[in-house]
C-alpha cells in the first residue's frame, strides 16, 4: 500500500515538474514573441520619425532635392507627405529666386524678400554713387551683324564689364542697350565706402578693355579691332531717391534724381574731352586717397545751374607711368593759367602735356577751346566753367 502511495506521489511530482517546464517554455516564447512584436511596432513608428527628423535637418542645411519616402498611412505618414509638399514649395520659391536673380541683382531680390519695408512705394532719400558705362563705337561695330552674332557680342561685353561692378559690391540697375547703369549705397554698401568701390570698379573695367577687344576680335573674325571701340564711364555721388518705383502692375527697385542725371551727363561728357572715365568732386572727396584723379575742367551740365569740378580717373595711386605723372602736372599748370585767362601760358602747358602723352583728349580739347575763347573772349563774370549743351 505504501509502495503504491509513493509511486503515485512520484507521478504527481513528475507531472508537476513537466507542467512547470511547459509553463516556463510557453512564457519564454510568449515573451520573445511579444518583444519581437514590440520591436516591429516601435520600429514602424520610430523609423518614419527618424526619416522625418533627418529630412528636417537636410532642409535646414539647404538641401531641398531629396523627398522623404512615405511608408505608412497613419498620422506620421500624413505628416511626412505634408513635409514633402512644403519642401516642394520651397524648391519652387528657390527656383524663382534663382531665376529672377539673373534679371534683378540677387541682393535686391534677397533684400525685398527679407526686408518687405524696402518695397514701400514712398522711397527714401539717400546719398548714393551712380555709374553709367557705355561702349563707344558699338553702333558701327554691330552694323551688319546677324541677331545671333549681336547677342553673343552683347553678352560678352556686358558679362566682362559687369563682373568688376558685382565684385566691388555694386548693384546693376539695368542694361540700356550697350550701356550699364549701376549704383552703390545703403542698404547694400555703407555710405562711406560707396564712392571708393565705384571708382575701383571703373578702373578694373578699363583694365579689362584690352582683353575684351581681343575676345571681340576673335569672336567677330576680325584681324584688328576698330580703334573707335572703347569705353565711356560717368560716376556721380550725391543724394538720390531710392525705392520701388513703377506702376501698380510692375515695380523696379532703383535710384532717381539729379545724381543719376549727373552720372549720365558725365558719361556723355567723355565725348567732349576724349576721356574714358569722368567723375565729379563729390565722388573724389569720398574716396580714400588710393586713386589718382586729374582735374579736367569745371562743367555746368544740362539740368543743373551750378558748375562743378570734374575729374578723370587715371588709375591707382603709385601705378601711373612717368609720362602720365608728367601729363597730370603739366595739365594742372595749364588749367590754372586757363582759368586766369593767361591763354598763351595755358596753351604752352597743354602742349607740354601733349608731348608727355600724345593725343591726350582733355589737353587737345582745352587747346581748341583756348582758340575759341581768344576769338570770343568770355565776360567779366566768367568762372572758368564750360556749359555742356548736349545730353
Where in the sequence are the language-model features?
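Juxtamembrane amphipathic/coiled-coil helical coupling segments that flank
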Residues: 1-23
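HAMP exit helix and analogous amphipathic coiled-coil linker helices
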Residues: 2, 76, 85-101
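Cytosolic-side ends of inner-membrane transmembrane helices, especially those
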Residues: 26-46, 60
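Membrane-proximal alpha-helical signal-transduction linkers
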Residues: 44-66, 71, 80-82, 87
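Membrane-proximal coiled-coil signaling linkers
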Residues: 91-125
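Catalytic NTP-binding/metal-coordinating core of nucleotidyl cyclase/transferase enzymes
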Residues: 119-201, 253
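Alpha-helical scaffold within the catalytic cores of cyclic-nucleotide enzymes
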Residues: 154-170, 186, 190-233, 258-271, ...
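Cytosolic regulatory/linker segments at or just downstream of nucleotide-handling modules
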Residues: 240, 269-345, 351-353, 357-379
Amino acid at each position: 500500500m505504501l509502495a503504491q502511495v509513493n509511486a503515485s506521489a512520484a507521478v504527481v511530482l513528475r507531472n508537476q515538474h513537466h507542467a512547470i517546464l511547459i509553463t516556463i517554455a510557453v512564457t519564454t516564447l510568449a515573451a520573445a514573441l511579444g518583444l519581437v512584436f514590440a520591436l516591429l511596432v516601435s520600429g514602424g513608428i520610430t523609423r518614419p520619425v527618424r526619416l522625418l527628423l533627418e529630412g528636417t535637418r537636410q532642409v535646414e542645411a539647404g538641401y531641398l532635392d531629396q523627398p522623404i519616402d512615405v511608408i505608412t498611412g497613419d498620422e506620421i505618414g500624413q505628416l511626412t507627405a505634408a513635409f514633402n509638399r512644403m519642401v516642394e514649395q520651397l524648391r519652387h520659391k528657390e527656383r524663382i529666386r534663382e531665376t529672377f536673380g539673373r534679371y534683378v541683382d540677387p541682393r535686391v531680390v534677397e533684400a525685398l524678400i527679407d526686408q518687405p519695408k524696402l518695397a514701400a512705394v514712398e522711397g527714401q532719400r539717400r546719398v548714393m554713387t551712380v555709374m553709367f558705362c557705355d561702349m563707344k563705337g558699338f553702333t558701327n561695330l554691330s552694323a551688319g551683324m546677324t541677331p545671333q552674332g549681336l547677342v553673343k557680342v552683347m553678352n560678352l561685353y556686358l558679362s566682362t564689364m559687369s563682373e568688376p561692378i558685382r565684385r566691388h559690391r555694386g548693384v546693376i540697375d539695368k542694361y540700356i542697350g550697350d550701356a550699364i547703369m549701376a549704383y552703390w549705397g545703403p542698404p547694400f554698401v555703407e555710405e562711406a565706402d560707396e564712392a571708393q568701390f565705384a571708382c575701383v570698379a571703373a578702373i578694373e573695367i578699363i583694365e579689362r578693355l584690352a582683353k575684351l577687344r581681343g575676345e571681340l576680335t576673335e569672336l567677330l573674325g576680325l584681324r584688328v579691332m576698330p580703334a573707335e571701340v572703347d569705353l565711356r564711364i560717368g560716376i556721380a555721388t550725391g543724394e538720390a531717391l531710392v525705392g520701388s518705383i513703377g506702376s501698380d502692375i510692375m515695380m523696379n527697385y532703383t535710384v532717381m534724381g539729379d545724381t543719376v542725371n549727373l552720372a549720365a551727363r558725365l558719361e556723355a561728357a567723355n565725348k567732349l574731352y576724349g576721356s574714358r572715365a569722368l567723375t565729379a568732386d563729390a565722388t573724389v572727396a569720398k574716396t580714400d586717397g588710393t586713386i589718382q584723379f586729374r582735374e579736367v575742367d569745371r562743367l555746368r551740365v544740362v539740368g543743373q545751374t551750378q558748375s562743378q569740378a570734374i575729374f578723370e580717373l587715371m588709375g591707382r595711386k603709385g601705378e601711373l607711368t612717368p609720362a602720365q605723372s608728367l601729363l597730370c602736372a603739366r595739365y594742372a599748370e595749364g588749367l590754372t593759367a586757363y582759368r586766369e585767362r593767361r591763354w598763351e601760358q595755358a596753351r604752352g602747358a597743354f602742349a607740354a602735356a601733349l608731348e608727355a602723352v600724345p593725343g591726350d583728349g582733355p589737353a587737345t580739347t582745352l587747346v581748341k577751346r583756348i582758340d575759341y575763347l581768344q576769338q570770343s573772349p568770355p565776360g567779366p563774370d566768367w568762372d572758368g566753367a564750360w556749359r555742356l549743351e548736349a545730353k
